[in-house]
Amino acid sequence: MFNLKIISLLFILLVTACSGENAEETINNTTNENDKGEITMSEDKVYAAMPEMTIDTGKKYTAKIETSMGEMKVEFFSDTAPVTVNNFISLSNDGYYDNIIFHRVISGFMIQGGDPSGTGHGEYGKYPGYTFNDELDSQQPYEKGILAMANAGPNTNGSQFFIMYVDYPLPYQYTIFGKVTEGLDVIDAIAGVQTAEGDRPVNDVTILGVTVSSD
């Protein structure tokens, strides 16, 4: 019975993806370049390619995630998940996560966000316009406060992430790239909100902004 519960929760963490020409055309049609020829985010938060590697893996990176229910501080694991950390930091610095909601909240499991459509479907493969490979070398367990990527299967990471509300024995199929070090009470508060169909909060819980720092 316990294994069946884990399997059912694994399905919840899947990001619904879409393959085929229609999705590709949507991405191509909604991406632009600036005057310098650099890839930029379109108005509806779609990119032509994943961010270039810009972080220094020798540095310690943290972020302040300000939400409508309080503030959390996250420490990133750039040593074990450098590409994922670079992706999250790049999107954060570009304002990608600003005003995006936590679209799925499951008390006793996790809170999930990062989808501009606010559905978890990512507009069926539209957001953020690219995918990248898993980084599964972390020895961290999926415990309270862990920050990890939601996906649609192996090597399909994009912008959606989840934060563990409780310790849970998930299989290592989701890239762990950080942990909440301050503001665990905010996770508690978010996990306690009333939800409706699809585990979506009745009243939106919104990411107001993400501020990244490095030592």
PLM regions and their residue ranges:
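Sec-dependent bacterial lipoprotein signal peptides
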Residues: 1-16
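Cyclophilin-like peptidyl-prolyl cis-trans isomerases
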Residues: 2, 18-215
